[in-house]
Every structure is written in structure tokens, then in C-alpha cells.
Regions:
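Conserved serine/cysteine hydrolase catalytic core
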Residues: 183-227, 233
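Conserved acidic catalytic loop of the alpha/beta-hydrolase fold
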Residues: 76-93
Length: 266
């Protein structure tokens, strides 16, 4: 990581902070979920940086990026990503997004067409209207307010207890990201989400949908989406929850590498 760039790009009228591995290699843009940050992708980026120019932005309201007063719907996040791609002059990048970042990647891919090379959706927030309402009416915001009132040591201790099965580095990266997430981004939980059936149908490049055995997107939904778009492949990672790239990083890397090889050969 010592040779990585840490910089800011003006995109969609705000400053987007990003980490970048660099080099004259195919670009790969990694989009984190709500309460994450670009740095949460560091283990995967280390594994891929010999072959890819990996770009890891902090979404608005997260990490070191700007926190505008409003503008926290998926269309806003997507415009930020498009602005980043244009600002950094990334030619035909592959997008990889998790959770909120997965939905954002789907929106971007549906809009940019063949200007991107492929898209990986890691347990994206493809929620039914009822589930969206349940999440919106939950105490997620209050839970985050309470977390922000704790000191760093307490947050890390809670994270280690809750995720004892995860690598210590991953636990710390995710905990640090949570502490740098402001309240405003939780507006993204306000229904309705973009219609994911429409988005997936509109994507014209190869798609990898990575799901967990205990995540958000069910195998039935994945198969339904596969029927909508023949470009979509599905991989299920066992013994993983919604944070599948944290729960099973080695298996996640394998399926990502396999898809990236497929895209490179197409």
C-alpha cells in the first residue's frame, strides 16, 4: 500500500477521495457499501494490483470524501462514480460494488453501456418494496448515532467480538470505516430503490452476481435475474453473510479473478 495514491477528484460537484494502486493496467473500480470506505477493499486490491489499476473511492458522506447536505439517493452516488471515471479518464473499467455499492454499480452500468467492460455485483441491495420499508423503519440510524458516540477502542472491541471469525485486518478496516461514516448517507435507505429488474435488463456487458448463503439476494432472485439477462452469471459463496468479501475473502477473490479473466478474454 505504500506505493498507492491517496488523492481527491472533483466529481459531480463534490470532492471524492480515492485510493489507487496505479500502473498501466486495466482499471477496476471498487465501490463499498453503506458505512464502508474505499480502504475496506485493501486486501482484495493487494491481491489484484499486479494485474489491475485498482481505484477505491470513498462514497459521499463516507471516509475522506465530501459530505453535502443532501443528495444521497442511488442516482447521486451513480453520478459521483460516472464523474470519477471521467475525471480520472479511466478507459473501459470493470466495476465491482458491494451492497449499496452494488446497486450503485448496477445503475452506472445500466447508464454507461459499453463504456464499461463488465460489472460485479456483490450481494447488492436488491430488496423487495416490503423489505425496503422494513429497513427504512428500523433503528439503523439510531444504532449508528450510538456508535459515533463511542470511543475508538470500544468500537474496535465490539467489532472484534461480533466478527471473531474475520481476519483482524478486515475487522479493523470495517470498524474504522464505520466511524468515518456520517449520518447523512443513511438517506439512501429511503424507499424506493431503483427497480433492479429494470437495471439488470438494461446492462449490456458481462455481469457477475455474487451472493451468499445468508445474504440479501436469494438464489431464487439470482436465477430470476439470470433469466432476464443472459450476460449474467451467478456465484454463491457458502458460509457467508451479507459481508461476503469479509467473511470469505479467499473464496471471493477466486470468483472475482475468474470473472475478470473471462471479461479480459471476451
Amino acid at each position: 500500500m505504500t506505493n498507492w495514491t491517496s488523492a481527491v477528484c472533483e466529481a459531480n460537484g463534490i470532492d471524492i477521495h480515492y485510493l489507487r494502486t496505479g500502473g498501466s493496467k486495466p482499471p477496476l473500480v471498487l465501490l463499498h457499501g453503506l458505512t464502508g470506505s474505499g480502504a475496506c477493499w485493501s486486501p482484495l486490491a493487494r491481491a489484484l494490483e499486479a494485474e489491475f489499476d485498482v481505484v477505491m473511492p470513498d462514497a459521499r458522506g463516507h471516509g475522506e470524501s465530501s459530505t453535502p447536505q443532501n443528495g444521497y439517493c442511488y442516482e447521486d452516488y451513480a453520478r459521483d462514480v460516472v464523474g470519477l471515471i471521467q475525471g480520472l479518464r479511466l478507459a473501459a473499467p470493470v466495476l465491482l460494488g458491494h451492497s449499496m455499492g452494488g446497486m450503485t454499480a448496477a445503475v452506472v452500468a445500466s447508464q454507461m453501456g459499453a463504456a464499461i467492460r463488465g460489472v460485479i455485483l456483490a450481494d447488492p441491495t436488491f430488496l423487495s418494496p416490503q423489505r425496503q420499508r422494513e429497513v427504512y423503519e428500523s433503528d439503523a440510524v439510531e444504532q449508528h448515532r450510538r456508535l459515533l458516540s463511542l470511543d475508538r477502542g470500544d468500537v474496535l472491541a465490539q467489532a472484534r467480538d461480533r466478527h471473531a471469525h474475520r481476519r483482524p485486518e478486515i475487522v479493523e478496516l470495517v470498524a474504522e470505516a464505520r466511524m468515518k461514516t456520517r449520518i447523512a448517507p443513511f438517506d439512501v435507505l429511503t424507499p424506493p430503490n431503483p427497480g433492479y429488474h429494470r437495471l439488470v435488463s438494461a446492462i449490456c456487458v458481462p455481469i457477475l452476481l455474487v451472493i451468499a448463503d445468508n445474504g440479501v439476494v436469494s438464489l431464487e432472485t439470482a436465477q430470476e435475474l439470470q433469466n432476464l439477462n443472459p450476460r449474467l452469471r451467478v456465484e454463491q459463496i457458502q458460509d457467508a453473510g451479507h459481508g461476503l468479501q469479509y467473511d470469505q475473502p479467499a473464496r471471493f477473490e477466486v470468483v472475482v479473478r475468474s470473472f475478470l479473466r473471462l471479461v479480459a478474454a471476451s
